[in-house]
A protein has these predicted regions:
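Active-site neighborhood of HAD-like aspartate-dependent phosphohydrolases
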Residues: 2-46
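Helix-loop "lid/cap" segments that line or gate small-molecule binding pockets
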Residues: 31-32, 51-66, 124, 156-157
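Short beta->alpha linker loops
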Residues: 23, 47-51, 91-95, 116, ...
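Short, surface-exposed acidic
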Residues: 37-45, 65-74, 164
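Asp-based, Mg2+/Mn2+-dependent phosphohydrolase catalytic module
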Residues: 2-7, 101-104, 117-225
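Conserved SAM-binding loop
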Residues: 17, 92, 110, 145, ...
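Metal-dependent phosphoesterase signature
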Residues: 58-98, 106
Length: 225
């Protein structure tokens, strides 16, 4: 794995920058229950960090086919839209704003590499006030193969104009971590719903409890004050 100092940072979004996975999990389990299907948390965790197409195939299998999946998808979108209308459904994770502001002040370019669509990325990050910190965005709708394939991370690095080996990726999921490693980047894991697998933990630079723990490491990782 590449070693510091790095010259750019690339972030996953869901479960890392914003606390979205829990609300989405609740929406899916509720929609499944309305169809008479018990979708366990362990079932939902199979889709975390995966590309939309792969996630949909897994959920279809759990829900009993395309038709019930599509019915559940409508209910999930309605529940999330209703929730976002009432409150900030996907708040920033602790430490995210401070870390991004510090990197920007230090002249370290940042990008997002997320399985979500680019319009969702822009909307959610703008809502929590951190979109201006990012010089580039790469969304799941822009690549043929999603995480754990490295395409998203490679696209983000290309848009920053930085070699992959000069990028430090921040991830929360197994599939995202594997994508960053396959892209040849340094990796920091901040687990959300799942702890990293042993092989990921061995390959990454650090496993942190929160992005708050990343801020003191900026001088070491980026050679920046």
């Amino acid at each position: 794995m590449p070693q510091p100092p790095f010259t750019a940072a690339i972030f996953d979004m869901d479960g890392l920058l914003i606390d979205s996975e829990r609300a989405t999990l609740r929406a899916w389990t509720g929609a499944a229950l309305a169809l008479g299907v018990v979708l366990r948390e362990s079932d939902y965790l199979q889709v975390v960090g995966k590309a939309a197409q792969d996630s949909h195939a897994i959920l279809q299998a759990h829900l009993g086919g395309v038709a019930p999946f599509e019915q559940a998808m409508v209910a999930v979108r309605a529940a999330l839209e209703e929730g976002e209308g009432k409150e900030l459904l996907f708040p920033l994770k602790p430490g995210a704003a401070a870390l991004l502001a510090h990197l920007q002040a230090a002249g370290i370019p940042c990008a997002v590499a997320s399985s979500s669509r680019t319009d969702e990325i822009a909307q959610r990050l703008a809502r929590v006030g951190v979109l201006p910190h990012f010089a580039a965005v790469a969304g799941g709708n822009e690549v043929l193969r999603g995480k754990p394939d490295p395409a998203l991370y490679l696209l983000a690095a290309q848009r920053l104009g930085v070699a992959p080996a000069q990028c430090l990726a921040f991830e929360d999921s197994h599939n995202g971590a594997c994508a960053a490693l396959a892209a040849g980047m340094g990796l920091v894991v901040v687990p959300d719903l799942l702890q990293p697998a042993p092989e990921v933990e061995q390959a990454c630079l650090a496993v942190l409890g929160s992005l708050e723990d990343a801020l003191p490491q900026v001088p070491l990782w980026f050679g920046a004050p």
